[in-house]
Amino acid sequence: MIIDKLYENVEKKGCVCVGLDTDISYLPKGFLNKFTNIEDAIFAFNQRIVDSTFDVSACYKVQIAYYEAMGIKGMILYKKTLEYIRKKGGIVIADIKRGDISATAKMYAKAHFEGDFESDFITLNPYMGMDTLEPYKDYFKNKEKGVFLLLRTSNEGSKDIQYLDLKDNKKVYNKVGEKIENIGKEFLGNCGYSSIGAVVGCTAEENNIRKELKHTFFLIPGYGAQGGKAEVAKSYLSGGNGGIVNSSRGILLAYKKYDEEGKNFEECARNEVINMKKTLQII
C-alpha cells in the first residue's frame, strides 16, 4: 500500500515534507529574468527544489490553488510538477481539500487519482460526513492511493468549529478523529498505519491525539512560517515516524536568510530541509 512506501521514506530520509506552494514572488529576480514566461520559470524553480531535496525529504505537497490561480497554463504547470516528482520515484500529495456528495466525490477521485492530475495522496475535508469518502475507497485497495482528512488544522479560525465542546467533554475534532481511526482500520498497511491519514496542525498542542489515533498517519502543517513549534510537531510523531512535517515558505524562501539574490536558492532549500530533520529528530 502507498502508506508503506511513505513510512519507508520517512525511515530512510526523515519526516520532512516539502511544500511546493510556489508563488511567482518567491522566485529570485535574477532567476526569473532568465525566462520569457512565468510558467516555465516556476516549473524550473520547482524542478531545482525537488532535485536538491529529493534524497533528504519524505515527500512533496503541491497546493493546487497556486496553480489554479494561473488559469489553464497554471494547471498544465501543476500537471508537469506532479509528473516530474512521480517519474523520479517520489511521493506527491495533492493538497486539494475537496469534500462533496458521493456522485461529485467520484469525479474528484477520478480527476486526482487518474489521468493528467494523478497524485499518490490527496487532502479531503470530511466535515460533510464520512459518506463523502466512499468513492475513494476502491483507489485505496486497488490503485495504491491514499488521503489525508482535515482533522485539526493549523489556521487560527480552526477553533470556530473544530474546537467546539461536545456533551462528553470532547471536542468536535476528537469525534472526527475517532471516525477517521475506525474507518482507517480497513486499509492498514504492513507498517501499521492506514492509507487514510489525518491533517493535524502543529500550531497547537494536544497531548492525547497521537495516543488516540494509533493507526492514523499524520500530515503535520504549520511548521515554520505559520509559527508551529518543533516540540509540538515531534509530539505527533511516534518514534520519529507516523507522520510528515510540512514546510513550504520556510523551504522555498530559505535563500533569503543567506543569499538575498537567490543565486543558490536550491542549496539553501536543501540546507533548510536538513536543518529541519535535525531539529525534528527524536533521540
UniProtKB/Swiss-Prot annotation:
Pfam families: OMPdecase. The keyword Manganese does not apply. Keywords: Decarboxylase, Lyase, Pyrimidine biosynthesis. The active site is at residue 97. Its EC number is 4.1.1.23. GO terms for molecular function: orotidine-5'-phosphate decarboxylase activity. Transmembrane segments: none annotated. GO terms for biological process: 'de novo' pyrimidine nucleobase biosynthetic process; 'de novo' UMP biosynthetic process. It comes from the Bacteria. Pathway: Pyrimidine metabolism; UMP biosynthesis via de novo pathway; UMP from orotate: step 2/2. It catalyses: orotidine 5'-phosphate + H(+) = UMP + CO2. SUPFAM superfamilies: Ribulose-phoshate binding barrel. Belongs to the OMP decarboxylase family. Type 2 subfamily. This is Orotidine 5'-phosphate decarboxylase. It comes from Clostridium botulinum (strain Hall / ATCC 3502 / NCTC 13319 / Type A).
